[in-house]
Amino acid sequence: MLFALGTGAISGGTSGLLDHDTERAQAIIDGDKGIDDRCDELIGVVKERLSSAVLDAEELEYLVAVLQFVPELERSADLAEHVASQTLENLSEVITARSRGLIQSMSDVAVQMWQSAGTAFRRGSREAAPALREADDEIDDMA
C-alpha cells in the first residue's frame, strides 16, 4: 500500500506541475500528511515488534528491510509534495520544453524504481538492489 501511495505521489506531483493542474497538485500536498502518518505508524509497529519479541532471522530481516525503505519512501513522497507545491507557485508556466522532458524522465524513473522495489519487497527478493542502484544513478546523472 505504501509503495502505491509513494508512486502515486510522485506521478501526481509531476503531472500536476507539468500540466499546471492545481487541483491534482493540491491533492498531492494534502495527501502527504497521510503518507507521513502511515510511515510513522509502520515504523512504530516495527520498533514495537523488535523490542518485544524473540525473532527468527527471516522476520528480523523483514523488519530491518521495512526500517530501510520506509524513510526513503517518505522522503520521496515529501519531494513529490514539494514538486506539487511549485504548481501553486506557477512554476509550470516558465518551465522550458527541455526541462519538462527532464522532469518527466526523472519522475518516470523514480516511479519505476518504487514499483520495482515494491515488487521485490513483496516477493522477498534481494535481486532488485543492483537495478535500483543503477536507476538511482540514472536520476543523479539527469540532475
Regions found by a protein language model. Name each.
Residues 1-143:
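Cytosolic, long alpha-helical scaffolding segments
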